[in-house]
Design a protein with these regions (language model features):
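A beta-strand edge to alpha-helix "cap/lid" segment located at domain peripheries
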Residues: 1-5, 14-17, 30-33, 37-122
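Generic hydrophobic alpha-helical segments
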Residues: 8-9
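Active-site-proximal loop/hinge segments that shape catalytic or ion-binding/gating pockets
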Residues: 25
Length: 122
């Protein structure tokens, strides 16, 4: 079953809605991004990453919600891990990039994504 924050994130990524994606990340969030060699440790770096991602006309993501595991750490704190596939275009051809993810979500916060790690599957 999909988590509402991940559905919101997925919909925003797939519609290239930068402000919606950006609004989900906490002011002190860290993003270890699929297509970046370095951890993104500020909101400016996170915004730059998604701005760059959205220059690709086919950039998008498909969650495999059946693979998702949720750990409830506290009343409003969850860790969610699983698999998704990034879509992008290279040389006019759609490319699928299988990846794994971990999110730390604080549901008590207006900007609930505290940490997001994403990496290509080996």
């Amino acid at each position: 079953m999909a988590h509402p924050i991940l559905e919101k994130w997925s919909n925003a990524v797939n519609s290239h809605n930068l402000e919606e994606v950006f609004s989900l990340y906490h002011s002190e969030a860290v993003l270890v991004a699929t297509f970046s060699p370095n951890p993104l440790t500020s909101k400016d770096l996170i915004k730059d990453y998604f701005e760059n991602l959205f220059t690709n006309p086919r950039a998008g993501v498909i969650f495999d919600f059946d693979s998702m595991s949720t750990q409830d750490l506290a009343d409003n704190l969850q860790i969610m891990s699983g698999l998704y596939t990034f879509l992008k275009e290279e040389n006019g051809v759609e490319v699928k990039v299988p990846a794994r993810f971990t999110y730390v979500i604080d549901n008590s916060q207006e900007q609930p994504i505290a940490h997001h790690h994403s990496s290509q599957l080996p």
